Structures are given as structure tokens and as C-alpha cells.
């Protein structure tokens, strides 16, 4: 079942070949993840930006982590609410995020949701699950030398941002550094409600 698969994946994370970084077109990956996200639920989907850069990442594992964040956003938000995702480069780091208008997480519970098999009280009431989703995301991001940032307000929604350093990645050419809709789209500096209309 799902629990066994999740535990196997976490066990594999200790292996040296857990990730296989390849030169990846981040804009293309962002658009592909966005397209796959559309099938996960009836929401107002919004692609905020796609970073026109290349990075040495494992696109399969990053897709897995990103879609886990999207699945969580769908699970903990209502039908037709907005779920947004995007990517950007800031200060030598690749940012890939998912934001929602869901139930949100109290500040004191953010560290709880980072623990394996743990979910907030509100999340437990809304749905079942293994409580391993964020552990898997954090494991994948950590294998890339990065971290998972969480910004949330109860009743307003959350923004989960995978932040990965680019120093080991190829430097984009000057023609690739421009981004589509990238200005002001990076969520780590915004509250979860910043994109609401």
C-alpha cells in the first residue's frame, strides 16, 4: 500500500543513488508539473511563474516532491479555491512553490507537520493519510542540498517552498535569465493570502 511505498522511498533516501541530478530545464519542468496538477482536483489553478534557467536536479524526484505538495494543497483546500505554483531564481537559489487557500497551519504546529506520521488536528479531521508526505518532500529537497520553507496562516492558507542552491548548477546564459511573470511572484516574501483577489 501507500504506507509501504512511502517507507521504502524513505529507506532508499540513505542510498547514494537516491537522486540522479541531470541538467534540467526548470521552466519546462514547472509547466509539466503544473499540467499534471490539473488532474488532482477542481481548483482555480494558477501558474505564477516559470524560472527560465537550468539546474542540476533530479527531475523525477523533484516532480514527486512538487506533486506531493500539490496533492496536500488540494486535500486541505475547498473546491474551486485557488492553488498556485511556480518557480523562480533568487539569490543563487532555485525556488519551487505551491500555495493554497486551505485550512492553514498554526505557527506552533509547523514543526509538528515536519515530523513523520504527524499531522495537525485540523488535518486529521479533514482526511486520512500516512503523515509521511512532507517527510518525503523534505528528504528529496535535503538530498539536493536544500530545504522546505513553510509559511501559513490558520484559515488563510499555506505556501510551501522548496529552496535548492544553484551553485553546482550550470549558469544560465543572459538570454535565459529573464523570467516569465517572475517579478514579485516568489512566495517566501509573501503571506499566503497575497495572491488573493
Residue ranges and their predicted role:
Residues 133, 137:
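Short alpha-helical Gxxx[C/S/T] motif in the catalytic ATP-binding
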Residues 73-74:
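Short helix-loop "hinge" at the ATP-lid/N-box region of the Bergerat-fold HATPase_c
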Residues 22, 44-54, 60:
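Conserved catalytic submotifs in the C-terminal HATPase_c
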Residues 118-128:
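Glycine-rich ATP-lid/hinge loop adjacent to the conserved G-boxes
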Residues 145-146:
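Conserved glycine-rich
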Residues 80-92:
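Short beta-strand/loop element within the Bergerat-fold HATPase_c
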Residues 105-117:
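Short conserved segment of the HATPase_c
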